[in-house]
Amino acid sequence: MADFSAAFERMIQNEGGYKLHKVSGDRGGQTYAGIARKFHPDWEGWKLIDAGDMESLELSRLVRSFYKERFWDKMWGDRVAAQSIAESIFDFSVNAGASIAVKLAQLVVGTVPDGRMGPKTLEALNQAEEGVFILKYALAKVTRYAEICNRDRSQVKFLLGWINRTIKGLS
């Protein structure tokens, strides 16, 4: 079964590591380790960051816990057989939301696309040919990113980064 720690380490690199930053035009506003204050204002880590305690082990624990509870657990990551499939869905869920990532996976494997992981989706994922799933899911992600840019032209500046992130996930 897939391992959260391995998936987390790969994802946190994609998110730029444990850094506080704000990118012009990013709808999430200020972020720390990929956690957007605008979308997650009640995350406990903001208290430590606002107090200037960005080197604490507690902050690192809160980051890991955030990603495990809000993304990995929602996609039943520990029950996905192939590490690469779990990592691909997990990384996209961090970028696009857990429901959207699961819905895209459901479309790829042919289960009802309701955005919630369930026994039928899990079974289909675990029976999927790993390489085929990864390629189809990558194409679905790129399509999703293009749709975002078509709806909101201000997001075009992020498109190449999103595509590169998707390509990196193929290796």
Task: For each feature predicted by the language model, list its residue ranges.
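Cell-wall polysaccharide-cleaving catalytic domain and substrate-binding groove, primarily
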Residues: M1-S171
